[in-house]
Amino acid sequence: MDLDFCTVCGATTQDGSLYCSSECHLLDFTKLDTQTTSNISVSSEYQFLVSEHLAHFHRKSMTSADFPTPRFSAYTKLHA
């Protein structure tokens, strides 16, 4: 594997360096910072949507019963 090329622009490098210049070195870190910020934003949006989804179903279960509750149990009807 030939490592004599800049990882940012593809220009030739000296001594097997990853970057051909300090500008490419800074550009590479700028890309990483932008990607990290983007990932954090997506992650927080995802967490918000999940929490809203769970809160919706929690509210729904608190306001309406899935099954009607009988006034008397079967035990009461049999032994009354």
UniProtKB/Swiss-Prot annotation:
<protein>
    <recommendedName>
        <fullName>Extender of the chronological lifespan protein 1</fullName>
    </recommendedName>
</protein>
<dbReference type="Pfam" id="PF12855">
    <property type="entry name" value="Ecl1"/>
</dbReference>
<dbReference type="GO" id="GO:0008270">
    <property type="term" value="F:zinc ion binding"/>
</dbReference>
<dbReference type="GO" id="GO:0005634">
    <property type="term" value="C:nucleus"/>
</dbReference>
<dbReference type="InterPro" id="IPR024368">
    <property type="entry name" value="Ecl1/2/3"/>
</dbReference>
<dbReference type="GO" id="GO:0000747">
    <property type="term" value="P:conjugation with cellular fusion"/>
</dbReference>
<keyword id="KW-0539">Nucleus</keyword>
<comment type="similarity">
    <text>Belongs to the ecl1 family.</text>
</comment>
<comment type="function">
    <text>Involved in chronological cell aging. Extends cell viability after entry into the stationary phase probably through affecting the Pka1-dependent pathway negatively.</text>
</comment>
